[in-house]
Design a protein with these regions (language model features):
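Bacterial N-terminal signal peptides that target proteins for export
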Residues: 1-8
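Extreme N-terminus of proteins, especially the signal/transit-peptide cleavage junction
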Residues: 2, 19-23
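Bacterial N-terminal signal peptides
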Residues: 8-18
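N-terminal, motif-rich segments that launch catalysis or mediate targeting to/interaction with membranes
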Residues: 22-168, 175-339
Length: 339
């Protein structure tokens, strides 16, 4: 067994600058949603579809651009998972207006649990690094599930909440959405915003660590392309990913997680441990080498390569997280939707 896998196994036994909203990109989120879709019975699919037709952007986004060979039910349900990213403002050239972007809630996509570089533990001892009162993904998931369960919630609000549940269960399984790396340098004394300020190279390409993990299941760099052709292509890519993962056999440790870890907090804790053990670690178990990267702007040329071992391990980790997200989300939806 390699040093890296020994280190990961050991970890498995443990159980105001805006942050980028994306976790898995559109391909990853829709792959989760497709796995969910295939696990729901016809009754739950019908409930979901009926509810989604009350969504304020049903015609404009959820049902838009559907290919002839995909049912409206499947198309709309799978696309719920990316609506919370679609409403994100796109800058000065965004012509969609407040009718779309007012639904954007960037703080709901993540939780910044501090991961302190072990060599600097004494420096940060006893310090409060993250405001405990900040709204985060755990609060958002609890609130959205309650909205769907509550009989007096209007259907339009339930439809919006369903989209958030689909999306955030995917987000919470992305390790870099559950962490902020700290060390005693001027660049990371306030954290790296979940890898958004941490530059590396992967396969020769400079990339922020957060973005690298976002794109592990497939690249959707042109996320603002709303054309029917582009949306159909991303949908097909997501279905390919879902098909490739459908037969993935989870290891005993992952099966145990499915049985034992049933709360949003436990899912987030899993992701945090993986961020520490895999996301920010080299193949020898040392802290991953990176360079400080600006929140906006180019990543410095000095960004170091993560290496083949890191790439393989990260990909395998992402695949397992997608499968866990799909299975857990399907079961959670059955609970909140009822029979």
């Amino acid at each position: 067994m390699s040093h890296r896998w020994k280190f990961i196994l050991a970890c498995t036994l443990l159980t105001t600058l805006p942050q980028a909203a994306y976790a898995w990109n559109s391909v990853g989120h829709m792959a989760v949603a497709k796995l969910v879709y295939d696990r729901l019975d016809d009754g739950h699919k019908k409930k979901l579809f009926t509810l989604l037709q009350s969504h304020p952007h049903y015609e404009r986004y959820l049902a838009a651009g559907r290919p002839d060979n995909v049912s409206e039910v499947e198309w709309a349900i799978v696309r719920t998972s990316v609506w919370p990213d679609w409403v994100r403002p796109r800058g000065d050239k965004d012509s969609r207006g407040a009718e779309v972007t007012r639904y954007h809630r960037p703080e709901d996509h993540y939780v910044n649990v501090p991961f302190i570089d072990p060599k600097d533990a004494a420096v940060f001892a006893g310090k409060t690094l993250i405001d405990p009162d900040l709204t985060n993904i755990l609060d958002a998931l609890k609130q959205r599930c309650n909205e769907v369960r509550t009989k007096t919630t209007a259907d339009i609000d339930k439809a919006i909440a369903v989209c958030w549940i689909f999306h955030l269960v995917g987000d919470i399984h992305q390790p870099l959405h559950n962490v902020a790396y700290f060390n005693d340098t001027k660049d990371y004394r306030r954290g790296d915003l979940g890898g958004n300020l941490f530059g590396v190279r992967a396969g020769g390409q400079r990339v922020k660590l957060r973005a690298y993990w976002d794109n592990l299941l497939g690249d959707d760099s042109n996320y603002a392309d709303d054309s029917a052709n582009h949306q159909a292509r991303i949908f097909r890519e997501a279905l390919k990913v879902a098909d490739s993962l459908r037969g993935l056999q989870l290891a005993d440790a992952e099966q145990k997680k499915l049985a034992d870890n049933t709360t949003f907090k436990s899912w987030s804790q899993e992701s945090f441990e993986l961020a520490k053990c895999v996301g920010y670690r080299q193949s020898d178990g040392k802290i991953l080498a990176g360079v400080p990267a600006p929140f906006k702007g180019p990543i410095p040329e000095a960004a170091p390569e993560v290496g083949d071992d890191y790439i393989k391990t990260a990909r395998a980790t992402a695949e397992v997280r997608i499968v866990l997200a799909g299975q857990r989300l399907a079961e959670r939806l059955k609970l909140v939707l009822g029979k």
